[in-house]
Structures are given as C-alpha cells and as structure tokens.
Amino acid sequence: YKLLVTNYQSPISTSTLALSEVEGFHFPLSTISWLLLTALWLLLSGIGGYAFQNWDHNWRNVVLRDLMNFNWPVYYAQPESGPVKMLVYYVGFWLPSALIAKFTNWQIANFALFAWSLLGLLLVTHQLASALKTSNFKATLLLIFFSGLDILGTLFFPQEYPTLFPPITHLEAWAGNLQYSSFTTQLFWVFNQAIPA
C-alpha cells in the first residue's frame, strides 16, 4: 500500500499535490485522478450497496450475509429435500470482508467489501498499466470502456431482444450462449469473478 500511495511516479505527469505537511507524503496529481476514477467506477457498480444494485447482487449479498451469520464452512441442512448442501464461493474474494463482518455489522461488512474490491481494482489497473507501459489512469479508462464489439453483432444479427434503443439492455444475446462481456459489465454483475480473475 505504501508503495502505491507514496512512491508512485507517473510516467506522464510529474506534478504533485501536497496533502499533508509531513515530509514525503505527496501524491502525484495523476495518482489522485486514478484513485478517484477507480473509486467512482466501483461506487457505480453497486458493490457495498452505495448505489443501485442490479438483480444479480441478490445472490452476492446472500453469500456475504451467510458468511457473516453462520459458522464456517457454511452448509445448509434440509433433510426433507436431500443431502446437506455447502455454500460455494470464491474464498479469496469473500472471506476478508466476511471475517470483518463476523465481529461488526452489515454496514461495516459492505464497506469492507467495497474497500477490498477497490484494492483489487487498484492492483489490477496498476499491473495493466505496468504491462502496457502507460499511466494507471489510462489503464483504468481502458478497462472501463473496452468491450467485445457486441454492438456490431447486434446491428448485423438483429433479434427482438436486445434493442439498441433505449440503451438499457444487454447486447450479448445476439450470439446465443456465447458472451464476451466488457469488464464494466462483469464488474457490475459478477464482480466476485471479475476482480480476482
């Protein structure tokens, strides 16, 4: 964390913004822009419950709630409906927030999930920027706006669903069961798979 925050040098901009009088505690302006853009993007995804959550969040919220409220490993015993069923989840993504949730409450658990997700996104965008030899801000913009050209498939192979206008539907349906969703779509729908992957 200290390496990302205090020692980051942007290849694009050398201007700094002093946030404290403490010697050595300066953020480059490009780092502040990157942090704010990434946090806003994550905020809009619905993670943490601070913005609209699409219906897929119903299942994700239940995973966190059950990890918070039940002993680990979580299992569901319903003798009348068959054998014991275990909760299946991405351990590295859910357990840090769930551990905090065990000792706090739902609001703090959601904040922990938001913070853990933000850290994951910051690491991903920083690694992408390093690989592409560009700024973290540009790498974040690339992830936000890069997509699988589904708009072309929708135009060339029109179906009743989805439509291009109003732009509130998914465009992946043109290819049947195949999907190449944008990273933003994945972040907003299946974040527990998108961020760790």
Model regions and ranges:
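Start-transfer (signal-anchor) and selected internal transmembrane alpha helices
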Residues: 1-16, 21-43, 130-141
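Active-site lumenal/periplasmic loops and adjacent helix-entry segments of GT-C-fold
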Residues: 44-196
